[in-house]
Structures are given as C-alpha cells and as structure tokens.
From Swiss-Prot:
Biological role: Involved in programmed cell death/apoptosis. Acts by recruiting ced-6 to phagosomes which enables actin-dependent cytoskeletal reorganization and subsequent engulfment of the apoptotic cell corpse. Has a role in the association of ppk-3 and rab-7 with the phagosomal surface which is necessary for the incorporation of lysosomes to phagosomes during phagosome maturation. Activates the expression of unfolded protein response genes, which are involved in the immune response to live bacteria.
FU repeat feature ranges: 629-682
Modification after translation: Phosphorylation of Tyr-1021, within the YXXL motif, is thought to initiate phagosomal formation.
Protein name: Cell death abnormality protein 1
Species per Swiss-Prot/TrEMBL record: Caenorhabditis briggsae
Length: 1134
C-alpha cells in the first residue's frame, strides 16, 4: 500500500511540473525582506498597527458516507452500497487581529524606490518642488498652491513673494525681477526717459526727428517751437512763430520775432513788447537792456552805447576838459580872453563854455586883480611879503607867494643852483652837461642842446625830431624820410623838394629831384613819384579815357558814392536823392509829416507817418482811416484794424496785436483761447491743483478737482463704492455673477478666473483661461484645452508635460499619461499611448501579450503557420520569426523572454510527457496487483463484513472524529449547525466564532488585494492537508486539466479529506464503543491495534513529508456509485 501511495505522489508531482507553476508558499524570509524595504533616513515613524492573520481551528462535523456490504445481489457483484453516519474532525482558518510595530513614512510623506521618505503634495507641484506635505516651493516666476500660475503683474521671484521695483508703470520679469520698460523709458528701474534720439521699449529704436524734436511712445515726432514737418525739418518762415508756425509776428521799428515763442527781438535803441519804445536815458542796445557805462552823470548813444560826454572826455567821461576846452568830448574851445596865457586867471564852464574869473580877479580877461600886486585880502589892506621880482604872483586872497622858476623861499628870495631843482631847490639834476645846457628849476629835467635828447641828454635825436631836447618834429609834410637833428632840414622823398619838402615836382615831371617827364595826354598831369597819369575827376584808365561807372566818382573814379537812396555825380560825387529821401547821402528819410522830392511836401496824418513817396498815411497798429484818426473797433486789431480776434472770454485786447490784455481766471493764450495747463488753475494759471492720482486735473477757474471715471471725493482719492462706477460714481453697476466684481471705472464686470462675458456667466471657451478668459492656453496639443482657472494644460490621451508637448513614456497611457499599461513588459509588447491597448510583438498573444503563440503558429498576432512537415534538421519554428537555425542568436529569443517574464515557466517538453505516460502505465500495473492481493488478504483474514467502532461518548467535542485516517469521506455540516441542536442533514453555516468559506475568502481578498481567494479551493471546507500545503495548493486536480467546481465532480476523481490529529494524545488511549450498523444483523467488535494502523498525525508526517503538494478532491456526497463504495471499503482496510 505504501508503494501505491508513493506512486500516486510521484504522479501528482510530475503532473504539476509539466503543466503548472510551482505553488506559492509563505515566504519564510518575509520579515527580512520587510526589513530591507523599510524606509530610512528622516521623516520615518514607528507605528503600532493591527494586522489580519489566520489561526487554525479544529471543527468536529457529523458526516454521512457510503459503504459497501456483501449482499445477495449478483448484479452488483454481491456488493451493495449502504449509507452510514459518523464524525469527522477538520481544520479551518480563523481570521484574527494582531498588534504589530512597523516603520513607515510619517503622515504626508511617501516612500521612494531607494527607501527614502519624501514629502507628498497632491495635486503635485507644477513649477516647483514639494518641500513639506502639501506645500510647494515654486520656481522663480510662478506662484499658486501648486505653482501652476505665473506671477501676477507687479510680483516676481520664489512664490511671487517679491514686488517689482520699477517706475513709470513698468512691469518686471517674473523670474529674475528685471524691469521691462514701457515705450519711452530705460534704466534698471525704467526711471530714465529715452534720449532725444531714441524711443520705444528700453529706448532701443532710433528717433528720426531733427532740430530738437522728440519721439512720442508711438514713434511720431513732437517738434520744438519754431519747427514743423513730419521730421521737424521745416523752420518757421520769417514773420511766423510757435507750434506749426501759425502765429503772426507784430514787432515794430524793424524788429524781428523769435520763431519759437514770438518774442520781439528789438534793434538797438528800442524796447517794449513790440519794440515800440526808444531807450530811456542811461540805457542802450537791443531791447535797451544794457546800462550806459558813463561817469559823472553822462548819457550814452542808445544804439552803440558810446558815451556822450559834455564837459568831460574819455571813453567813460572820466577826464575833465582841459583848460580852455568845453562841450562834447571837450572838442570846443573857450573864447574867453586871456586864456591863451598860461598864467591867466580866467576859465570857462566845461559844459557851456561860459567865461569865469578866479577868485580875486576881475576884468574881461580876468587879468585884473581886485587888489594891487603887492596887497591882498578882502579889502586889499594886507601887504604881500614876496620878493616881487622873483615872484610870479602874490595871491590876492591869501597873500601866498608863488615863486618864479629858479627861486625858492617863503618870499621867493633865494635862487636855485644850476644842477638843483624842485621845491626849495632840494633835488639834484642828473644831466650830461656836455650836451645839456641847463636843468628845469621846477622839475629838474635836463634841457638838451640841439640834436640831443634823453633824460640826461646823452642820446641823439630820433629820425623825425630835431632841435634842443629833440623837442621839435621834422616838418617834412609827410614827404620826407626824417630830417637833420641840428637844423631840421628834411630828407625829401621822390616827387618833392624844398627845406620841408613842401614843393611838388613841377608840372609834367616826376621822380627823384623831379628829373623825369610825364608820358600823358595833353592837359593831363602825372604822378610826381611814379609817373602814372593822374586822371581828372570822372575819368579813369591808363590814359584817362574811360568814364566812371555808376557808384564811383572823382579822380580815377577811386571814390565811392555814398548815396543811400539816390545817385551821385561822377565828378563831384554830389547825390541826387530819390523821392522821400534827403540829406547829403540821401540816407535821411523824410521827417514826420513830409514826403516827396527833397521832402518838400507835407502830409496831414493824425499821429502817424505818411508814405515818403506818395504822402499816403501809414496808420500805426490799432488805428485806421484815411488820416489814421479812428481807433480799432472791438475784436479787431493790426494794420488798418483788418485782423479780427477769435471769440473768447477776453475782456479787452491790444488793438495793435490782438493779444488779450487781461484773461479771466482759468484761461491763457494770446486770445485766452486755452484753458490753464493740466495741473494749474486761477489767474495767470499760477496755482497748482491738489488732486490725487484719480483726478484728471482740476477746474481751471476754481481749482476744484475733476475726477476721472471711477473716483470721487474732494481730491479724487477715493474709488467708487461697490455697485457704482463712472463719472462721479453716478452709474449703477450691472448684476455681475457671484465671485466677480464691477470695474469702478468702466462698469464692466471683472470676471474671476475661468469666466467671461458681460456678466461673467459664461465659462472660458476652449483655448482660453484666467480672469475674463483673456489668457491663451499655452498647450501645444491640437486640442488647446487647459484649466480655466490656472491655465494648467489638460493633456489629451497620449500626451503629458506642462504644455502637453511630450508623448507618454513607455509603459503609460491615457490623459496626462497617468495610467499604467497592463502589458507584460516591454519585451513582449508595446502599449498604445492613447488607449492602453497592448500591441503584441511578433510571437506573443493574449490581451496583455502574456502568452506565446500556440504551437505551429508564429509572427505578428500569431497569424502565420509553421510548416506542417517541420523546419528541418537543426531548425525550429520560433514563435516570433518562424523557421530559424537553433544557433541563430534571435532563434528562440521570444521563448526566452517569455520564460524570463513568467519566472522560468515553460511548456513541458516531450520527455516530460513520456515520463508521465510511463508512470501512468506503471501505476496501473501496480494498482491491479495491489487490488488482487488485498482482496485475497481480506478473505483470508476476516470473511465477515467489518463494523465501525465509535467512542462511547460520540457527542463529546474531542471525540467527534473517525480514527481511520485513510477513509474516504465527505465533510458535511448539518443544515442548521451541528452543535446548536438544529436539524441535521446537508451543508449548513459554520458554528459561532468560525468563518464560513465565503467570509474566509472575503477576508483573504482584503489581505491579499482582491481577486480569487488565495486558498484556490473549490470544496466546502479546508482540511488540514490544505492548510499544511500552503495558501492554495495546486491549481488543477486531474489529468484532464478540468478544474473541479464547488458541488461538482470530474469523473472518478475523489478528494480525500484527512482528519486532523491536533486533538490531545489522551484521545488515542480512550476505548471505542461498538455501534451497530443500520443494515447489519449482528454487532461485531472491531479491535484495532494502535500500532497496527496509521494515526492521522503519523500519516500526515509521513505523507506530507513525501509530497507536500498532494491533494485529491473529495467526492460529491450525492454520488452513489458502487465502484466508489467498493473502493472506499477497500481503502478502509488497506
């Protein structure tokens, strides 16, 4: 019998090697593997957890089984099937909970492949990294909870936490913070305006404007005053000024106006707004802005500034007139008698020339003393003490003695020596007495002899001087080259003769000593020096045969006419003036009221001039009429009042130029046609508005702030309250959807992210996102679909990345590539990135490409067939490429990949099948032999039918079992619980505290992740054999490969249910009670020795050690097959 069991075990093992994977057993190294996979490093927590586990529980069952007995029925071989009852012990796993301490990543962290704990952010950070659970640290330029939004305007940096430091409305780079300047500005903070030759963002574009013009932010030229044209190339014409040269100049007295602002540029001698006033006394020059630099209260020329010195001379009138001079620049000579004498007591007034006598003198020539020569005093009663012979004069008023030269002393009684001089003759004269005759007693100056000069008379006379002290100038009339120093005789030049060269050469002679004869026509002399003919007035040429051209006159026509407004006589140069002019040079216009030739005619104009030629009155600005006696009417001005002013608020205008004299508060300009410039108000626009940024300037008259739409308040500093907008916040906002707001300026609904429309009720269309859906999705896929709030791209199936521009990586598919492909590895298949469908490589098939092509097929989708007669010696049919040589590298590669993928599982080879067939045949022979000898043994040992021996207390829990471990039987629960007193029969629920099979399988699914129960059982109750065999045992149970289902039977295959031996050993020592069988007539005692049969425990040790996988299903309890009954009876006693 042991031999038969061994053969059965071997057969089962061989069957499983050929057709099934090795069963899975509990991993004894699981705890070690768990330790290896435990997280390490930071953020690791140790937690106590409750884990599910199973414990074995023995269950005692009431069973009904079939047996065979000898009977008289020959049709059944004298063996009849009878039903018998008994007890059976089985073991069932019970789910229990146990405490266990494990290491795992702390809450908010997840374990990586290298067993580190990293923070978990869900949803994941888009443009940043997860630094804490649920907290993203955004890359520069991005913000939001998951870093999916670009920084808003005015912020930048990590988490958009920094504010842009820019001016003039500039934004900054969201990553670097660099200011992005608007058009017209540059600099690190956009604080600088563009240079005059640049414009645009960061001032990189060249400005074509000329002459100081600048480009505005659109690149158009803004010209300076005085220029116009597209590029400011056109200068204002004379008489025009201002912007676009649209204003007329109205300057007088020949003044010009500035083409930029219209200011009159007066000629010298005039001033005033229109240059209509002559310079005041003491001022001169253009605009009379220069002050005369004359001293002593003297005036200057209003045009040149030259001092008009009367009674004074010098550039600044700083020198008084010399004795005997008076008048302008002291040019006039006094006519007072006696002034020609040095000692005259007369003088004249420097300004008027009136003669005056010094004090103490009288007479027409002031040469008469009031007192006698030797008396003085008011009444001439005092006697002079002077030596009158040595005295020039005794002062008539003081009696002071004025000594003659060469005398000194109080009374002039002493004479100076030859070489002394000065007051009291105290100074010594330094003369060369060889050439000096005497020294001046007054100043000690040496008096040189003729032909000598110099301080001490040691130098000869210069070339043009002669006589004592060389004081006399040679009188050669400019016709000689110096003279003799002693007597002054001239050295005459050619053409002259005489002591003083006072005589010309005689007629018709010229040259040195007048020795040459002239070669000129009769009556025409020649130059006494050169001999050239000297033409008479009005003629020119070498021979004096050409008349003077117009504009010249005189001898040889060398003189130029000075006639300004006329012609001159070619001989005399006398001017013949044009009408309206007079004077020697015709430069004098007719005086006011005169006109015609020589200004002889008179005109009768009222306070105006008349034409010098025609006598027609020329009215000044502001006058009109034939005689210019009528003033301009209101709103007219200019010459003859022909110009009209534009209607304005001006109270009165200047009739000369139309400029408003007094503009009302709030206006400016020539005609008060302009409001005050932005930001100013009041009279002369002198006050500045005090309005905030929300103001659009102020009222030019009152200064009251004019608020921009959306603002209100005295200074326009307050925004409109909620629900209001527009000017003065007078308009009501529309009903915007919840979550949106009304713009305080325009009244438009300001939609939040994801909404658009007039009232923010319409979600963003495809391809748009953000506030008001103004942002365009940056996704590159053809769908352009992104999150309406954040702009995050919603990638279609098959794409991923921030912009959905990256295809799914291998092994992933679907929207955003978040689904993992179920294909069995990349070696056997590729996964469709859109649908996830596995696309099998050649040689593989199945939904997940997990199987090789069936035998005799190969290629893509296993669509090709191998040759029916084989590939030939040394060749095989590869599942991928078909027939190939076994030594070819790629031959058999698909099979290798399949085996590697399935852990080495492969189809059984032909040798395995031969071994199986051999074992089956051997088992058949041994089985027949065993059956023959068994029947023979039974007949010889005990011809009677056996009885079953039960314990005397069969209802005791520990004795509810059969003691024959080899008996084939079905374990069955009573219908309503075998141990609760309910009715018996059928399969019922598990006793209290135990799990039913369904509950057990359900708990097993919870632990092991769903799917089929890991027990892989199809019978009602687990036996100890199955528990010992691991978690499930073999997947198949018959040679036909048909899996048994619960409540089904496949042929004659049976499931031996082995009784447990976990009961106490004392149970084996108890006696057994004979229980009569229902169909027997006599009771027999069957005494079975404990050492003559297997206990269940010994059998399990023996049987399971030889074959841990052995498991043969129990038969269906309803089968009443005689063969089964007979086999059961035979097995009972084997």
């Amino acid at each position: 019998m042991r031999l038969l069991l061994l053969v059965g075990v071997l057969l089962a093992a061989t069957w499983q090697v050929g057709y099934t994977r090795a069963p899975t057993f509990p991993d004894k190294s699981k705890s070690a593997a768990d330790a290896i996979n435990e997280p390490k490093g930071e953020h690791v927590c140790t937690v106590k957890t409750i884990v599910d586990d199973y414990e074995l529980r023995k269950v005692i069952h009431q069973v009904v089984y079939n047996d065979t007995e000898q009977c008289l029925n020959p049709l059944t071989g004298f063996q009849c099937v009878v039903e018998k009852r008994g007890q059976k012990a089985s073991y069932q796993r019970q789910l229990v909970q146990k405490e266990k301490y494990i290491k795992q990543c702390c809450e908010g962290y997840y374990q990586t492949k290298d067993n580190q704990c990293q923070p978990d952010c869900n949803p994941p950070c888009k443009k940043g990294k997860c630094v804490e659970p649920g907290k993203c640290e955004c890359d520069p330029g991005f913000g939001g909870k998951i870093c999916s939004s670009s920084c808003s305007i005015g912020t930048w940096g990590l988490g958009c936490s920094k504010k842009c430091d820019c001016e003039n409305g500039a934004n900054c780079d969201p990553e670097l913070g660099d200011c992005i300047c608007p058009s017209g500005f540059q600099g690190k903070r956009c604080e600088e305006e563009c240079p005059i030759d640049k414009w645009g963002p960061n001032c990189v574009k060249s400005c074509p404007c000329q002459n100081g013009g600048k480009c505005n932010h659109e690149g158009k030229c803004v010209c300076t005053d005085g220029w116009g044209g597209e590029y400011c190339l056109n200068k204002c014409e004379e008489g025009k000024f201002g912007a676009d040269c649209k204003f007329e100049c109205t300057c007088q007295n020949g003044a010009t106006c500035d083409n930029t602002n219209g200011k009159c540029l007066c000629k010298s001698g005039f001033h005033g707004a229109l240059c209509e006033k002559p310079c005041s006394e003491g001022f001169f020059g253009a605009g009379c802005t220069q002050k005369c630099q004359c001293l002593n209260n003297q005036d200057c020329d209003s045009e040149t500034g030259e001092c008009k010195c009367i009674g004074w001379t010098g550039k600044q009138c700083d020198i008084g007139c010399a004795r005997g001079r008076f008048g302008l620049q002291c040019k006039q000579k006094c006519t007072c008698p006696g002034l020609e004498f040095q000692d005259s007591n007369a003088s004249c007034d420097a300004k008027t020339g009136e003669c005056q006598c010094e004090s103490g003198y009288k007479g027409a020539n002031c040469d008469e003393r009031k007192c006698s020569a030797d008396t003085y005093g008011a009444d001439c009663s005092k006697q002079c003490s002077c030596v009158m012979s040595n005295t020039v004069m005794c002062a008539p008023n003081t009696g002071f003695c004025r000594c003659k030269p060469g005398f000194y002393g109080d009374n002039c009684e002493l004479a100076c020596s030859k070489d002394s001089y000065g007051p009291n003759c105290e100074k010594q004269a330094m003369c060369d007495w060889t050439h000096a005759s005497e020294a001046d007693p007054a100043n000690g100056k040496c008096v040189c002899k003729s032909g000598r000069s110099g301080a001490n008379c040691s130098q000869p006379c210069p070339i043009d001087f002669y006589g004592p002290n060389c004081a006399l100038q040679c009188e050669c009339n400019g016709r000689g080259i110096g003279c003799h120093g002693f007597d002054g005789k001239c050295n005459c030049a050619p053409g002259y003769t005489g002591h003083r060269c006072e005589h010309h050469c005689p007629a018709l002679t010229f040259g040195a000593n007048c020795e040459k004869r002239c070669q000129c026509p009769a009556g025409v002399g020649c130059n006494p020096i050169t001999g050239e003919c000297e033409c008479p007035a009005g003629r020119q040429g070498l021979k004096c045969d050409i008349s003077c051209p117009e504009g010249s006159y005189g001898p040889e026509c060398k003189l130029h006419c000075k006639c300004v407004n006329g012609k001159c006589d070619p001989e005399t140069g006398e001017c013949s003036c044009e009408p309206g002019f007079g004077g020697a040079d015709c430069s004098t216009s007719c005086p006011k009221g005169k006109y015609g030739d020589a200004c002889e005619l008179s005109c009768d104009c009222s306070d105006s001039y008349c034409s010098r030629q025609t006598g027609k009155c020329i009215c000044p600005l502001g006058k009109k009429g034939t005689l210019c006696d009528q003033p301009c009417e209101a709103n007219t001005y200019g010459p003859q009042c022909q110009l009209t002013t534009t209607p304005s608020q001006c109270a009165s205008t200047d009739p000369r130029n139309g400029v408003c004299l007094t503009c009302p508060p709030g206006s400016s300009g020539h005609q008060c046609e302009q409001n005050c410039p932005q930001g100013t108000y009041g009279t002369d626009c002198a006050s500045k508005c005090a309005c905030a940024d929300g103001g659009h300037g102020c009222d030019p008259t009152t200064g009251e702030c004019i608020c921009e739409p959306g603002y209100h308040g005295a200074t326009c500093s307050e925004k409109c309250p909620d629900g209001k907008f527009g000017y003065a916040c007078a308009q009501n906002c529309p009903k915007c959807a919840a979550g949106s707001s009304c713009d305080h300026i325009s009244g438009q609904c300001v939609c939040p992210a994801g909404l658009e429309g007039a009232t923010c009720t319409r979600p963003c269309g495809v391809g748009f996102w953000g506030n008001g859906c103004r942002q365009v999705c940056r996704c590159t896929s053809e769908f352009k679909q992104c999150n309406a709030q954040t702009g995050e791209c919603s990638c279609p199936a098959g794409f991923q990345g921030d912009r959905c521009d990256k295809p799914c990586e291998d092994g992933y598919y679907g929207p955003d590539c978040i689904k993992k492909c179920k294909c069995q590895g990349t070696a056997t298949a590729s996964c469709n990135r859109v649908t996830g469908v596995c696309i099998c490589h050649p040689g593989f098939t199945g939904e997940f490409c997990h199987a090789l092509c069936p035998e005799s097929t190969f290629g893509l989708r296993c669509s090709k067939e191998c040759p029916k007669d084989g590939c030939g010696d040394g060749y095989e049919c590869d599942a991928a490429i078909g027939c190939c040589h076994v030594d070819q590298m790629s031959c058999g590669k698909a099979k290798q990949e399949f085996e590697a993928l399935n852990g080495g599982r492969a189809k059984s080879s032909g040798a395995t099948w031969l071994l199986i067939l051999f074992i089956i045949g051997l088992c058949g022979v041994l089985g027949l032999a065993a059956l023959f000898y068994r029947n023979k043994y039974q007949k010889e040992k005990d011809p009677d039918m056996p009885t079953v021996s039960f314990h005397k207390s069969p209802n005791a829990e520990d004795n509810r079992e059969f003691q024959n471990p080899l008996y084939n039987r079905q374990s069955v629960f009573p219908d309503s619980g075998a141990f609760s007193g309910s009715s018996e029969g059928g399969v019922g629920a598990a006793p209290d505290g135990l799990l039913t099979l369904e509950e057990e399988d359900l708990e097993d699914k919870k632990i092991h992740g769903g799917g089929a129960s890991r027990n892989m059982r199809n019978h009602d109750y687990a036996s100890l054999d199955e528990v010992a065999g691991g978690e499930g045992g073999p997947a198949t149970s018959s040679s036909s490969g048909v899996q048994n289902r619960r409540g089904q039977n496949s042929g004659d295959v049976r499931r031996p249910l082995l009784n447990s031996e976990d009961v106490d050993d004392d149970d084996e020592d108890e006696d057994f009670e004979e229980i009569p069988h229902e169909n027997r007539n006599s009771t027999q005692k069957l005494s079975l020795e404990r050492n003559s049969k297997f206990s269940e425990k010994n059998f399990k040790k023996k049987f399971l050690s030889e074959n841990p996988y052995a498991h043969i299903p129990s038969p269906d309890p309803n089968i009443q097959n005689s063969t089964n009954s007979r086999r059961a009876q035979e097995n009972l006693y084997t």
